A protein has these predicted regions:
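A conserved segment at the C-terminal end of the G1
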Residues: 208-224
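Histidine-anchored nucleotide/phosphate-binding helix
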Residues: 129-139
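General small-molecule cofactor/ligand-binding pocket signal
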Residues: 86, 175, 252
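Canonical P-loop GTPase G-domain recognition
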Residues: 144, 151-206
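N-terminal accessory targeting/assembly segments
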Residues: 1-128
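Helix-rich effector regions associated with P-loop NTPase G domains
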Residues: 3-4, 24, 54, 60-71, ...
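Structural beta-sheet core signal
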Residues: 118, 147-149
Length: 357
């Protein structure tokens, strides 16, 4: 493969999946996704592509379809810079959340990420509970989480904030940045070696697009002012896009989120809150809910001032959220199975009737 392909992130993990390419296809990486339209990069340049009907039909869920960062098989149309995506290669990592809306389904936001920059602003956006939520998502993705505390120039409690965040994120790296200063943002380049793909995850207005623009050295993504009345930013990134740095590495910008709803992070929540999990082992009752039960080591730690009650509430809230989604998924699966059995029975009855004629 070409040096460009290696810089894009192609490696032995993906090569092993296609030792023999299907005739007329070539590997490519998804750079941009706009609804059902994609821009992909192959060894000979960029193509505009759509998903074949067969791939869409065979995909078990929306999460199985291509997203930015995916490696896919492309069937180009001869003589044109367009083609069809016929397959999605197995993902090495994936950043997922529960899709917005009432339906309980997985939404993959980006695939094959090596480093996930979790960005929060040191302004009205600063929220330890949100960082906990993002960290659980990062751990589940299998990407390396890196905490970025942006807008350090607007903060008067930087050292205090770093100490608070350290207590929450454990050993994950923490960096403070001023997105408008290329020198300040330069510390993030250490994570962006050739072939490495990094994504930025954070709520609206934390400065993700400005950080990427500083790393690129020019304004690739639009930025907007944060509203002073609420501290919230407007969505300036309307789609996900992968860009290649001239110095090596790849960056993915994602639209800002009002809320990140967790998806399948049961074990990861335990890892994020390992201090509470360790205390829970000392509770008198194995099924202790850390509420009013006697002999609760967790409540004792709160009462002694050793455990932040807000952290305990965050832990309990995330567990309730996961339990709700788990039950919703089970109910939906049962209804789907029941519907499938009914259809099979109707087909069976029709077959029997035809044979009796």
């Amino acid at each position: 493969m070409s040096d460009f392909f290696l810089q894009l992130g192609w490696n032995a993990f993906f090569a092993a999946q296609i030792r023999e390419l299907p005739p007329g296809t070539l590997p490519a990486r998804v750079l941009v996704q706009r609804r059902t339209n994609f821009l992909v990069a192959a060894h000979d340049g960029e193509y505009r592509a759509t998903v074949t009907g067969r791939l869409r039909f065979l995909s078990g869920a929306q999460a199985d379809l291509p997203v930015v960062g995916d490696w896919v098989l492309l069937r180009p149309i001869p003589g044109e810079r367009t083609g069809s995506i016929t397959a999605v290669l197995q993902r090495k990592t994936a950043v997922s959340r529960r899709a917005p809306g009432r339906e309980d389904v997985e939404q993959v936001m980006a695939a094959n990420i090596d480093v996930l920059f979790l960005v929060t602003g040191l302004d009205e956006n600063y929220n330890l509970r949100r960082i906990e939520r993002y960290l659980a998502t990062a751990i589940r993705s299998s990407a390396q989480p890196v905490i970025v505390l942006n807008k350090v120039d607007l903060c008067s409690f930087v050292e205090e904030a770093i100490a608070e965040v350290r207590a929450v994120v454990g050993t994950a790296p923490i960096h403070t940045t001023n997105a408008l200063s290329r020198e300040s943002v330069g510390q993030l380049r250490a994570y962006l070696a050739p072939g490495v793909t990094a994504a930025f995850l954070g709520s609206s207005g934390v400065g993700k697009s400005t950080l990427i623009n500083s790393l690129l050295g020019h304004e690739k993504f639009k930025t907007a002012e944060v509203r002073e009345d609420s501290g919230r930013g407007r969505h300036t990134t309307s789609h996900r896009e992968l860009v290649v740095l001239s110095s090596g590495g790849n960056l993915i910008d994602t639209p800002g989120m009002r809320e990140l709803q967790l998806w399948g992070v049961d074990e990861e929540v335990s890892e994020v809150f390992d201090d509470i999990e360790e205390l829970a082992q000392q509770c008198r009752f194995r099924d202790c809910r850390h509420d009013q039960e006697p002999g609760c080591a967790v409540r004792t730690s709160v009462e002694e001032g050793k455990l932040d009650p807000a952290r305990l509430e965050s832990y309990a809230r995330l567990l309730r959220e996961l339990d709700y989604h788990r039950r919703s998924t089970d109910i939906r699966a049962r209804l789907t199975q029941k519907g499938k059995e009914k259809r099979m029975m109707r087909q069976y009855n029709r077959t029997i009737k035809r044979k009796r004629r």
